[in-house]
């Protein structure tokens, strides 16, 4: 690192005065490219770390058989990487990393070379293996779905610095910055100004938000996830329920996506265009006037200077 220390438990792996050689760090890594030796069989690839670590041959064979069973490749030991599918090659890479019983498992974009359906399958497979072996795992990905499915805790890193760290649902439901809100899932970001202790305004649009103690006149940014917004037929003037924002708008576009419909709705009270995710079949078409309802609790306030 440029500064500070790298620790695993009480062990210092790297500091200004200490550097532990890689072979003594008790770590294993799974690469984006799998890094399998094409001239070696599956069993020989998996055995490499055991051989390097001095594990006796008789003991190696038992460990190889056990780990291939764990990754659902029992009977594939004599095959070569070129005879395997992408998903099977990934499982070999996972087996090679796990068989040495590392203290830390590192994965660098391990699923990026797989097609969409296989990538989804391997997410759950990696999670299953993590739960079985209980190895602390550091997983690097730009795929938010992978991060949400696989992790217990996730860190969003921006320009080399941690922007926010927490459980996946915390990052999604309560982002602390504009960057995190946009990076984890889809969202509507509204630049506004605080007009009371618990609400913001943009033009004639006024929103109750999930915050208190705002200073009137202070700039603010509100994040609203598309799935928390409800659309309905526009009725007469109604008094919103406590803690609810009741707005009106017009549908600009309704896009059928199979299991959902993606709407774009322009709000009458301002120049804001909201993206809304709703169930199928579509409940409104382009040009339809609609009511727009969103709970104040779902309007997350973010720093305006992010």
Positions of PLM-derived features:
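Conserved ABC transporter NBD signature motif
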Residues: 4-15
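A generic structural motif
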Residues: 188, 255-258
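OB-fold (S1/OB) nucleic-acid-binding surfaces
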Residues: 201-205, 266-271
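Short aromatic-glycine-enriched beta-strand elements
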Residues: 260-263
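C-terminal boundary and immediately downstream tail of ABC-type ATPase nucleotide-binding domains
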Residues: 173-196, 223, 293-295
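ABC ATPase nucleotide-binding domains
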Residues: 22, 26-28, 32-179
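Glycine/charge-rich catalytic "coupling/switch" loops of P-loop NTPases
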Residues: 204-255, 281-306
């Amino acid at each position: 690192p440029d500064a500070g220390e790298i620790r695993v438990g009480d062990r210092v792996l790297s500091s200004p005065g200490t550097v532990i050689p890689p072979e003594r760090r008790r770590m294993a890594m799974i690469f984006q490219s799998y890094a399998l030796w094409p001239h070696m069989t599956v069993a020989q690839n998996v055995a490499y770390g055991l051989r390097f670590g001095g594990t006796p041959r008789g003991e190696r064979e038992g460990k190889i058989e056990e780990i291939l069973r764990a990754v659902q490749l029992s009977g594939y030991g004599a095959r070569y990487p070129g005879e395997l599918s992408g998903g099977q090659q990934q499982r070999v890479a996972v087996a090679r990393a796990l068989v040495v019983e590392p203290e830390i498992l590192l994965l660098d974009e391990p699923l990026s070379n797989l097609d969409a359906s296989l990538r989804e399958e391997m997410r759950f497979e990696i999670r299953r293996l993590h739960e079985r072996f209980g190895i602390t795992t550091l997983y690097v990905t730009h795929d938010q779905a992978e991060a949400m499915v696989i992790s217990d805790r996730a860190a969003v890193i921006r320009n080399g610095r941690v922007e926010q760290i927490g459980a996946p649902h915390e990052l999604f439901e309560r982002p602390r910055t504009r960057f995190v809100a946009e990076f984890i899932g889809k969202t509507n970001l509204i630049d506004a100004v605080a007009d009371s202790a618990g609400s913001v305004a943009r033009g004639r649009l006024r929103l109750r938000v999930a915050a208190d103690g705002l200073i009137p006149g202070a700039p603010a940014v509100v994040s609203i996830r598309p799935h928390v917004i409800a659309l309905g037929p526009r009725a007469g003037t109604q008094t919103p329920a406590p803690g609810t924002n009741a707005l009106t708008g017009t549908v600009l576009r309704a896009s059928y996506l199979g299991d959902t419909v993606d709407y774009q709705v322009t709000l009458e009270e301002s120049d804001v265009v909201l993206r809304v995710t709703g169930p199928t079949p579509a409940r409104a078409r382009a040009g339809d006037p609609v009511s727009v309802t969103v709970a104040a609790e779902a309007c997350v306030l973010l720093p305006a200077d992010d």
